[in-house]
Structures are given as C-alpha cells and as structure tokens.
C-alpha cells in the first residue's frame, strides 16, 4: 500500500478527480489501480479566493514495489504505515478473575470494550443510569431544576461528553495511530465514515446516544457485563508478600466483588470515590 500526501484539488472538484490525480501522480494505467482510500482531508484557506482541499491517500496498485523504488526520493510517495490496532494481550482460556472497570465515560467505555475484545469478559460498573434514562434526568435538571445526584450531566453512561457537541479532535500526537481504533469503533457504532479522514471530525450529540448503546451491546456480545446504578463505596487493599494489592470492591448495595484487576475510569467529578 502506498501513501500519497500533499494532493491538492479544487474545493468543488468532482468525485472522479481523485482517481484521476492518483493515476497521473503515479503514472499508471487504470487497470493497475486496485483501490484507494482517503486517509485525511483538510483545507488550505491561506488564500480566501482560492481555497483548496488537501488530501492524504492510501493507494493499492499491482505495482507497489516498483513504484516505491521508482519514487524513492519523492517525499510525498511512501509506503503506508500500519495503522491497525495491536491488542496488548489475549485472555487465557481459563479466566480466574474478571477485571472490573469503574465508570462508563469515554475512558471506561473503551476500557470495557477493549478488554471484552481481548476475551477478558469485564464487569463495567457505572454509578449513574443508562444513557437514555440519564438523558431524561439531565434535561429534567436543565428544564425543571430537579437534580438527581447520581444521574446527571456528569454521572451516567457515556460520561460528560455525551452532552457535548461531539467534536473529536485534540492536540495530542498519536504516532501509533491509537485514535484510528477509536474512530473505527465509532464508525461501526453508527458514526459517519467521514470522521475517519476529515481534519476536524464531528459526530453530534444526538448520534452519540445511539452509538453509546451499540458499543455497550458489543461488550455484552463479547461476554462482558455493564451494571448501572452501581456505585463503588469502598475498596479493600491487602498485604501480599510485603506488597499492597487491591482485592475487593464493595458496592453501595452491599455486594462485594473480589478482583485484583480494576481500571478506575471515574472522571473528574466522583470526588467521593477519590477519597477511598
């Protein structure tokens, strides 16, 4: 696979212009082009009367090796980097303990999803309600000033970002392309495919609710659990051979979960949990 960068086209170009520019840039016949995808699309608006689109394309041809050799000195034609996500582990066949994720905001949601995809069958605990019930409680506060302290704009499935405007960009460098995994999961859950390549991807609040539900369903399909209105009120830490080790979680309901593996994805507002 080849990566072509610095591809410039008019703002209102025709769809077929992309294929044509690939053929011209690589100097190949149409039958040698297998496929191409847009990896990134941005704007060059430095001249307001001549705004252009800037593309980065991933291209597969029948002559990849020959073309890489021929364009060896061209900085805008290189081999495409591997952007596939590499799981750090796979669960053993006999799982002695299930990991627990506390909180189901963005961090907890993806922690639960990735653990489930690796076969660890996680238990995700969320002190708030599932996203649609939580939406009712949140709008109840905004419109009627009725506050549910456990289900609001901060607590509940999806986290605080559920009621944001759904923008998906940051200033964080991502050399290993972890964000690609996130965006791919969003697309599988119903986000528009263009978030994979536009410079400032945006989903929108109303799509987020359905997407969060689909991602939760995926955790269940892979053997995990998601439990709502399950606040963690205490943790037990034991001394094992001179080392401190978490051993139990006690829920507000009184239930005790024995586990040595916990991801605290509690956001910035669960201050009662911070004090444990």
Model region roles, listed by residue range:
Residues 3-51, 57-276:
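Residues forming the flavin
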């Amino acid at each position: 696979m080849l990566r072509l960068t610095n591809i410039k086209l008019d703002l209102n170009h025709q769809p077929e212009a992309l294929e044509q520019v690939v053929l011209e840039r690589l100097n190949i016949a149409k039958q040698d082009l297998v496929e191409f995808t847009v990896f990134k699309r941005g704007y060059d608006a430095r001249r307001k009367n001549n705004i252009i689109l800037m593309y980065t394309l991933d291209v597969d041809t029948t002559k990849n090796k020959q073309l890489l050799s021929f364009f060896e000195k061209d900085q805008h034609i290189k081999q495409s980097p591997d952007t596939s996500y590499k799981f750090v582990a796979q669960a053993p066949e006999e799982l002695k303990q299930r990991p627990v994720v506390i909180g189901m905001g963005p961090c907890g949601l993806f922690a639960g999803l990735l653990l489930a995809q690796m076969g660890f069958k996680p238990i995700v605990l969320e002190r708030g309600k599932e996203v649609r019930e939580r939406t009712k409680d949140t709008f109840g506060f905004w419109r009627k000033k009725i506050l549910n302290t456990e289900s609001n704009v901060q607590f509940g499935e999806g986290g605080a970002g559920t009621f944001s405007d759904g923008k998906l960009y940051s200033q964080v460098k991502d050399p290993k392309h972890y964000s690609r995994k996130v965006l791919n999961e969003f697309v599988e859950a119903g986000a528009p495919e263009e978030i994979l390549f536009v410079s400032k991807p945006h989903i929108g609040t109303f799509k987020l609710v359905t997407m969060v539900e689909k991602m939760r369903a995926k955790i269940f399909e892979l053997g995990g659990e998601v439990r709502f209105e399950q606040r963690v009120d205490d943790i037990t830490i034991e001394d094992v051979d001179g080392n401190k080790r978490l051993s139990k979680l006690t829920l507000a309901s009184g239930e005790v979960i024995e586990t040595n593996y916990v991801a605290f994805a509690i956001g910035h507002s669960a201050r009662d949990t911070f004090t444990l």
